């Protein structure tokens, strides 16, 4: 993490010194230097925000605002937002939601959207093909809802796959990439999914792409005499 913070700081100092020394001696060069400083400052801001958020989540200082909502409607809205964002980046997006209209979930809409956004951002970060593709599928798996987010990026090595949700873990591709992240984004995702009583895992093939899966329980009205749905077995690393 100290390296990730120091890298943009070093770049900012270098470009500021260049401006002070008169190296940026044309309007074009000055514009390029200022834009680079701005971008590097944004990188630092994002990293600090991720660190702050993870610290709050890790110490249970994030207040969750759970509400009962339509699974089809909520994930449909998420899909529409992704479609607009990815279309602007030239990424093909495919969405499928086979949930019944009356199926409901108890979620924190803001935090669960963060899960989806973090996963897709991670996909875009390592998209190495000109015809990039992202897919989102929401389906019924009994007492649970399963969300699948896939891409056709560079994929993850088999040796790295078991650890991608670990805090600060970065794959070789991430460490060697100029776009490599802090290793916090997916650990935040895991924490939020688990706070929703769910589970998350991934499959991947190098050169072909990665698919992230997470499951959350459906909302179920149970009487006092009924068996509590909290005793249901949570799907773990099983594809349906």
Where are the regions a protein language model picked out?
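Short helix-loop "hinge" at the ATP-lid/N-box region of the Bergerat-fold HATPase_c
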Residues: 123-124
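Conserved glycine-rich
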Residues: 197-198
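Conserved small/polar residues in nucleotide/adenosyl-binding loops
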Residues: 230-236
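A conserved beta-strand-to-alpha-helix junction within the catalytic ATP-binding
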Residues: 65-83
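Conserved micro-motifs of the catalytic ATP-binding
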Residues: 59-64, 104-107
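Short alpha-helical segment of the dimerization/phosphotransfer core of two-component systems
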Residues: 39-44
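Short conserved segment of the HATPase_c
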Residues: 156-170
